[in-house]
Amino acid sequence: MTHISKPVGNEITCIMYGINDAILNNAEKIEKDLLDAAAQEDFEILKTVSYAFHPQGFTAILLLGESHIAIHTYPEYKCLVFNLYSCRGPEDGRKTLEYFRKQLNPSEVDIKEKRIKIDSKE
């Protein structure tokens, strides 16, 4: 018998275009904005890892009790890629993304959202 469970998680990927490259190279601002965004939904931040590339670009990962948030900047394209997965529920992450997006003020966004279903294979 196949059992299909309700969605147990949510994954959001967003590509943000038209961001000022001075912002995209400001690792401190982006990391603060990302932490503040995660606080919008009370995500449990277990660890933060970040790395600034030379001559430009930045990547950061927030390891969450609920899974992760990861970003990577492409200043040469005025672009940032945001990815969030949360196992708390199918609506999680939307407030986090919206807050983060407002801080960066992109001219255009491409958002893909996917409900993650886990089916018992036993």
Predicted segments with their positions:
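Polybasic/polar functional segments that serve as interface/processing modules
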Residues: M1-E122
